UniProtKB/Swiss-Prot annotation:
This is 2-amino-4-hydroxy-6-hydroxymethyldihydropteridine pyrophosphokinase. It comes from the Bacteria. CDD domains: HPPK. The gene is folK. GO terms for molecular function: 2-amino-4-hydroxy-6-hydroxymethyldihydropteridine diphosphokinase activity; ATP binding; kinase activity. Belongs to the HPPK family. Gene3D superfamilies: 7,8-Dihydro-6-hydroxymethylpterin-pyrophosphokinase HPPK.
Amino acid sequence: MIQRVYVALGSNLAEPREQIQAALDAFERLPETRLVAVSPLYISDPLGPADQPRFVNGVAALDTNLAPLDLLDALQAIELEQGRVRDLRWGPRTLDLDILLFGEQLLDLPRLKVPHYHMQARAFVLYPLADLAPDLRLPDGRHLPELLAACPFEGIERLPGA
């Protein structure tokens, strides 16, 4: 069954906008998956160590027949192809791809939590998501406009021409 999936994209190394575009191009090649929409891009302050570049962020909507862990594996393979190194939590990275929502599913697996944990506190996730689905209700019952109202538009700005 086709599921609508929202994936967060982020990069702060090696030409971040190009990294995100390369990831979107890779989404087009995923089996049983179609890229439906992409939010405007934003620039945001890093969550982790302050001595790193600001991030470029966005959200993509995909329709997929892949199982959640199969999609996660495919996204992590894209990260690796683009030079992702997992050494410092919340450190700089060429590409970060996170499954935010997977249809109406609630998942609490060792490798995957859906809705994505802490998304409600991350402006760089909520605002691009709202660009794609402004009235979205999450599978756990939370309503995106309420999450936005509780998450100030701080440390983030929409990129011109994005």
